[in-house]
Each structure stands twice: as structure tokens, then as C-alpha cells.
Amino acid sequence: MVLATSLKGAHVLITGGTRGMGEAMVHQFLQEEANVSYCARTVTNTEFDEFYKTLPEGNTARAVGTAFNVASKEAIVDWVKSSAERLGRIDVIIANASPMHMEGETEHWVESFAIDVMGFVELVRAATPYLEQSPQASIIVQSSFMGREFYRSPPAAYGPCKAAQLQHVQELSHYLGPKGIRVNAISPGPILCKGGPWEKYSTLMPEWVEEQRLKIPLKRLGGPTEVANVAVFLASPLASFVTGTNVLVDGGIHVGTQF
């Protein structure tokens, strides 16, 4: 038996879709023939022109980008509305955008809460009326294994805001479940992305990165496509009885390890 995601023709919204794991998610959903609306602070709408050339003949799925700051409730509402009007439906939303602040100054807490927490909250609020009309509605938030357990000292904004996302996933799964909307989180561990923090660490602190690699049971860093594949699964009918859960994509580093 061949497992099919049945995402052809679906409409997926992804925040932070121009680089790293967000970009990989756009790629994977396009390969599944789902149409994508993505956003980032800077968008050219040429980000995926080269990728389209790799799609099989007959795959006409496309991605349309919009530039705005996810910290703006009004911008989120406008984006969701215009995206729904463009394709007449919304089936999946993925809250992926994050400032990834590993610092703990007041401005870092404020921006992290505005994007990681309230950006997720407002995206769900704006999209729910459309998701209620979908036969395969799915909400996914990109959290982190740092939202699950202690990571580092001194205290920083990133981990607690990611923990708030995980709590909200549990609340939403109970509230939206009767409406046929599934809600789940993905918590990546050390993922090596072009332009991402682990690429920077690899350049600035290669010995430290090697120490961390050896702490991972699988003895390697993850890749963005490995996270995107989980997003595709959670968005698809293959995960039709999965809601309120947090999928760790971290090579096993959460099992009793500390950085």
C-alpha cells in the first residue's frame, strides 16, 4: 500500500517562509501539489522560481508571498483574508516565524512574545472561520525542544515563549477539536539551516558544536527537510487522529541531555 498525503489542491499558510525550516516547508508542500501562501518581513515573490523548475510536469502548485511583520495583528488579519479570497479556501496554517532571541533584555522578551506567542494566537483567530469549512483542517506551530526543558543560562526569551506555544496547542486542540480542526506542535532540536543559528555557531564555535553533536544520540545535526516532512505528515489525513501533541524532531537530544 502506498501512503498518500492527499494534499493536492490544499491551501497552506506559512509564516516565515523564505528561509530555513519555513522555506523547506514551502518546498515540501509544493511537491505535494499544495498551494502555499507565505509571509516574511522581506518578500520578492521570486524566492521559489528556481524550485518550480524541479517540480514534475503537471504539478502546477505555486507559492505567493506577502511582506509584513507577524507582530502586527492587523497585518495578519489582512493576509489571512486576502489569501483565502485568492484561492477560496484555507486548509492548513503553520506558525513558523520567530525572532529566535537567545538574549534576555526587555526588548527581546517583548518581540519574542509579540511574534512567537501573539503571532500564533492571532493567526489562529483569523484563520479559524476558514478552517472550519475545510474537511482536512490542521494547525501547526513550530515550537522548540527548548520550550520543553531547560536549555541554557542566563535566562532568555526564546524558551519560555516556545513553552507558551506548547500550552496553547493543548488548549486549542480541545477547543477546536469538535470543529474538526487538529492542532499540533513540532519541536526541532539542533537543525543546521543556511543562515541559521547552528550555521553561525559552526563558524564561530566549531569545537562547541562538535561537543553538542556528540551529545545527540544520532550523532549529527538535523536538516530543515527533516522538520518539513513532519509538517507535511501532520497537515495531511495521514495524521487524521493526531491532535494536541508535540512532535520532537531533535535526534533524541531531549532524553536527559543538557547543553
Swiss-Prot record:
<dbReference type="InterPro" id="IPR002347">
    <property type="entry name" value="SDR_fam"/>
</dbReference>
<dbReference type="GO" id="GO:0140723">
    <property type="term" value="P:patulin biosynthetic process"/>
</dbReference>
<feature type="binding site">
    <location>
        <position position="191"/>
    </location>
    <ligand>
        <name>NADP(+)</name>
    </ligand>
</feature>
<comment type="similarity">
    <text>Belongs to the short-chain dehydrogenases/reductases (SDR) family.</text>
</comment>
<dbReference type="GO" id="GO:0016616">
    <property type="term" value="F:oxidoreductase activity, acting on the CH-OH group of donors, NAD or NADP as acceptor"/>
</dbReference>
<comment type="function">
    <text>Isoepoxydon dehydrogenase; part of the gene cluster that mediates the biosynthesis of patulin, an acetate-derived tetraketide mycotoxin produced by several fungal species that shows antimicrobial properties against several bacteria. PatN catalyzes the conversion of isoepoxydon into phyllostine. The pathway begins with the synthesis of 6-methylsalicylic acid by the polyketide synthase (PKS) patK via condensation of acetate and malonate units.</text>
</comment>
<feature type="binding site">
    <location>
        <position position="162"/>
    </location>
    <ligand>
        <name>NADP(+)</name>
    </ligand>
</feature>
<feature type="active site" description="Proton donor">
    <location>
        <position position="144"/>
    </location>
</feature>
<keyword id="KW-0560">Oxidoreductase</keyword>
<dbReference type="GO" id="GO:0016491">
    <property type="term" value="F:oxidoreductase activity"/>
</dbReference>
<feature type="active site" description="Proton acceptor">
    <location>
        <position position="158"/>
    </location>
</feature>
<feature type="binding site">
    <location>
        <position position="96"/>
    </location>
    <ligand>
        <name>NADP(+)</name>
    </ligand>
</feature>
<keyword id="KW-0521">NADP</keyword>
<feature type="active site" description="Lowers pKa of active site Tyr">
    <location>
        <position position="162"/>
    </location>
</feature>
<feature type="active site" description="Proton donor">
    <location>
        <position position="143"/>
    </location>
</feature>
<dbReference type="InterPro" id="IPR036291">
    <property type="entry name" value="NAD(P)-bd_dom_sf"/>
</dbReference>
<protein>
    <recommendedName>
        <fullName>Isoepoxydon dehydrogenase patN</fullName>
        <ecNumber>1.1.1.-</ecNumber>
    </recommendedName>
</protein>
<feature type="binding site">
    <location>
        <position position="158"/>
    </location>
    <ligand>
        <name>NADP(+)</name>
    </ligand>
</feature>
<comment type="pathway">
    <text>Mycotoxin biosynthesis; patulin biosynthesis.</text>
</comment>
<keyword id="KW-0963">Cytoplasm</keyword>
<dbReference type="GO" id="GO:0005829">
    <property type="term" value="C:cytosol"/>
</dbReference>
<dbReference type="Pfam" id="PF13561">
    <property type="entry name" value="adh_short_C2"/>
</dbReference>
<feature type="binding site">
    <location>
        <position position="125"/>
    </location>
    <ligand>
        <name>NADP(+)</name>
    </ligand>
</feature>
